[in-house]
Amino acid sequence: MGFKQGIRALLSGMALVAALHAPAAVLDNLYQVQLTQQEDQSRDQALREATVVMLQRLAGQNVDLKHQAIANALKSPQELMSRIATAEGGQLRIQFEPDALGRVLKQSGQPLLGPNRPGILLWAVEAGELGDRLLSPVAPRALLLKQAAQHRGVALSFPLADLQDLSLVSEQVIRQASSEELLEASKRYPADGTLALVAGGSDENTELQWTLWLNDQHQSGTISGPATQAADELMQALAAQVFAQYAIPAAATGEHAEWRLHVQGVDGVGAYSALLGMLRRLGTQQQPRLLSIEGDEVVLQVSFPGSEEQLERMLGLDMRLQRIEEPVREPEPEPE
């Protein structure tokens, strides 16, 4: 189902092209929250806590919990849930209903981030008495980071750490957060962001030094505290960076800009359905409108509430689009 595509604004003349071979990281369990009910916590309080976590995954850490629509939903959070079960270890496993959440967040006018997230590739070392060592994906600290990433809706992945990786990335490269080597080594993976992490200390007092590259932005910081808390704070920081760049702003009817999408290589119903599915996830209030079909090229009109930069990022996230020059059309021959 490979096809090339380009997008062109009705006024600005923007064009992009890509091959559909590297999809975005789709969080399959985005609408499921697991948490432990504390001894001093009632079941209703635990359900409200899970609902806040779910709302933050979709609408960011700064979601307005006092907005009337959200506050009312938090009074009876069970109405947003499709299933409540008990997992291993006594944890609550709560499955939320996407449509019910969507209605509440739409009423509150919150910016939203869907299940398609930019993948973040983690290069990490553990500091020990004998020096730094690469963090194995199955090490206890790595499993803690994976759990925290799932809890906060972050699409975290680990490199293979094979000979090709090790020829470019050493423990020192990760500790120094050397962007040239790390970004070069990350090119072989379908990730949008690169994270360098140095983890040290004990479970009771962990220190995490992190650096994130996401698109053209670069952030770094240090987090200290108990291991579980530090991992959660790190994932909240990463989630905030993802949300800032990829969240789709709310817009009233009539505030959407209109864009024209030129798609080449649509060679069947499957490719066309995939394209429409991607466009529907852009946060539009209207269905994409088919303008024309010529051979294997279709032209659709879409409305989008964000900026040109946000639209380009969202399309690139789903279809790995890259900006290109708009093709120059040959002039029509003058009649003789």
Please describe what each predicted stretch is.
Residues 1-11:
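Bacterial N-terminal signal peptides that target proteins for export
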Residues 19-22:
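N-terminal signal peptide c-region/cleavage motif recognized by signal peptidases
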Residues 28-36, 186-233, 312, 333:
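Amphipathic beta-strand/beta-sheet edge segments enriched in Tyr/Trp
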Residues 30-70, 178, 230-234, 270-282:
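Short, well-ordered alpha-helical segments
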Residues 49-66, 122-175, 275-299, 316-317:
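N-terminal segment of the mature soluble domain
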Residues 65-126, 134-140:
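Signal peptide-directed extracytoplasmic domains
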Residues 76-87, 157-160, 174-209, 292, ...:
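A short, hydrophobic beta-strand-centered structural micro-motif
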Residues 224-227, 255-336:
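C-terminal soluble interaction/assembly domains
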